[in-house]
Amino acid sequence: MILAKCCHDTDILTWLVGSPCREVSSFGSLAHFNSAHKPDGAPQYCLDGCMHRDTCPYYAPRFYLEHPKAISDGFVSVVSLDPSHEAVLHALQRGPYGRCVYQCDNDVVDNQVVNLLYENGVSVSMTMCAFTEHCERIINVMGSRGQIRGNMESSTLEISDFATGNHTTLHVHTPSGGHSGSDAAMMREFLQTLRSGRGSKTSADASVESHLIALAAEESRLQNGTAIHMKEWRTTV
């Protein structure tokens, strides 16, 4: 999960800290989306007459057929390339996105915490959780002279100065497009690098490091939170 969804977070965190990561520890599990929590009598597919459709928060048709932003937010395109009601309905009847969430072969965690210790002494705590109303990123940077809180959904940065007591809120422009404009920006940067012959603003080594941290987090999780020493562990992968 951390590699798939949070390796860019470890990338940004490492850039902010400005130091190599020294140790990683992590805990996480598939706590809820498993057969132990399956409602009694629930069929394998939501559309096979599930008696819990009005009470189950994960009833698939509610998200892909009834949600007002199902198409605009891109949910439907994952289920079916044809966004018509009939096509999506057919895909949910026997496709993977129409299965009961408690009866899938998923082995990916639904919650995970990662602790990072950097060579310069900075420590980081990162939490990934599936159970949240808002799918957003929140960062809280706590320093000796101030604090910065960032909220990706509201596109704001809140800056607090301990010495003066001043509080400043910055509203950041968020471009449209995939990953808040990052997909197009990465392609532009890649093409400019090829055309100019100059190096990229971010190195391949930095990208690899963010992936290694994510892999180390999973290694630690599988070892019940045992701390992974990055300098030694890098030589084994």
Where are these predicted regions, by residue range?
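Soluble or luminal CAZymes and related metallo-dependent hydrolases
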Residues: 1, 5, 106, 182
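Generic anion/oxyanion-binding catalytic loop in active/binding sites
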Residues: 2, 103, 196
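Oxidoreductase and adenylate-handling cofactor-binding alpha/beta cores
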Residues: 3-32, 38, 42-43, 50-51, ...
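Short, solvent-exposed loop/turn elements at beta->coil junctions and helix N-caps
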Residues: 28-32, 101-104, 129, 205
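C-terminal helical cap and adjacent loop that interface with cofactors, partners, or active-site loops
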Residues: 107-237
